[in-house]
């Protein structure tokens, strides 16, 4: 088995999908999890206005609405959380995503004060954060807020990770990567677009340039610029296509280097890090 085949298998990626079937699969997956643990009453997700959170949010709301109708349990709810750092540049996209998702409840938690307080506490301890590390601080603060909300609403935190993101480890460890349940796992980026199109999502929400937008010094830095490869490259790789060797090497380099992000804390029984 080649490394490409190993990666495709590990991430559950497929070269072709039926969007309607994958929508149903994700919704049923979320419903089944909640039914297994009836003490859970909410799905919680941060909405950024980008493709991934818009899709995960819509699927979550669909799952909650169906389960509420089927069980008569009106305590079930989907909570969409806006988590700006100060004022978000693409706030209108966030509002458009909320309008498309139609969540049961919307909360807004501005994380700027918490991030600055944490940064100041570290500064007083003699640690000055770099812009990159401050970006990770933002991602972790967002996740902390979501878990606090989930804790107070008997909920679970929904993640937006998918195969095209997982392969490169393009997420913050214990930040946006630290979630309870990931309904998009297995899909690549273009397949996520197919699901949103099938759901009737406004095109600008899934055709916009993907960006984590975590760094102050490089605002709205495109994911593809940070990675050195395009999502089309990554999707082609995950679909089993043959790529330029240099591009394939870059993708595989990211996969190997970020394996620790896809694992629980390393123990003496792990050896993946030795390769």
Curated annotation (Swiss-Prot):
Catalytic class of the enzyme: ligase
Keywords (A to Z) from UniProt: ATP-binding, Ligase, Magnesium, Metal-binding, NAD, Nucleotide-binding
EC numbers on record: 6.3.1.5
Gene3D superfamilies per UniProt: HUPs
CDD domains membership: NAD_synthase
GO biological process, one term: NAD biosynthetic process
Binding site for Mg(2+): 52, 165
Positions annotated to bind deamido-NAD(+): 140, 173, 180, 260-261
Catalytic activity: deamido-NAD(+) + NH4(+) + ATP = AMP + diphosphate + NAD(+) + H(+)
Protein's pathway: Cofactor biosynthesis; NAD(+) biosynthesis; NAD(+) from deamido-NAD(+) (ammonia route): step 1/1
Binding site for ATP: 46-53, 160, 189, 211
Record GO cellular component, one term: cytoplasm
Summary of subunit composition and partner proteins: Homodimer.
Matching PANTHER family: NH 3 /GLUTAMINE-DEPENDENT NAD + SYNTHETASE, NH(3)-DEPENDENT NAD(+) SYNTHETASE
Protein family: Belongs to the NAD synthetase family.
Name used for this protein in its record: NH(3)-dependent NAD(+) synthetase
Organism: Salmonella enteritidis PT4 (strain P125109)
């Amino acid at each position: 088995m080649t490394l490409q085949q190993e990666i495709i298998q590990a991430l559950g990626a497929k070269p072709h999908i039926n969007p309607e079937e994958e929508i149903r699969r994700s919704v049923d997956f979320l419903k089944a999890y909640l039914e297994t643990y009836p003490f859970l009453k909410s799905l919680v997700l941060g909405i950024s206005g980008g493709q991934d959170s818009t899709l995960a949010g819509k699927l979550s709301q669909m799952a909650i609405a169906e389960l509420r109708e089927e069980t008569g349990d009106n305590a079930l709810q989907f909570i969409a959380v806006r988590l700006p750092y100060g004022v978000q540049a693409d706030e209108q996209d966030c509002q458009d995503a909320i309008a498309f998702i139609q969540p049961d409840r919307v909360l807004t938690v501005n994380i700027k004060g918490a991030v600055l307080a944490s940064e100041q506490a570290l500064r007083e301890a003699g640690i000055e954060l770099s812009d990159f590390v401050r970006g990770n601080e933002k991602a972790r603060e967002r996740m902390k807020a979501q878990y606090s909300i989930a804790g107070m609403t008997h909920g679970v935190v929904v993640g937006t990770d998918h195969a095209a993101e997982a392969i490169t480890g393009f997420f913050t460890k214990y930040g946006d990567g630290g979630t309870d349940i990931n309904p998009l796992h297995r899909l690549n980026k273009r397949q996520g677009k197919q699901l949103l199109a099938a759901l009737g999502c406004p095109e600008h929400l899934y055709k916009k340039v993907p960006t984590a937008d975590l760094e102050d010094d490089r605002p709205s830095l495109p994911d593809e610029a940070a990675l050195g490869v395009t999502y089309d490259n990554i999707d082609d790789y995950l679909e089993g296509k043959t790529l330029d060797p240099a591009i394939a090497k870059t993708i595989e380099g990211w996969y190997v280097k970020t394996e620790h992000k896809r694992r629980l804390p390393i123990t003496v029984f792990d050896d993946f890090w030795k390769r």
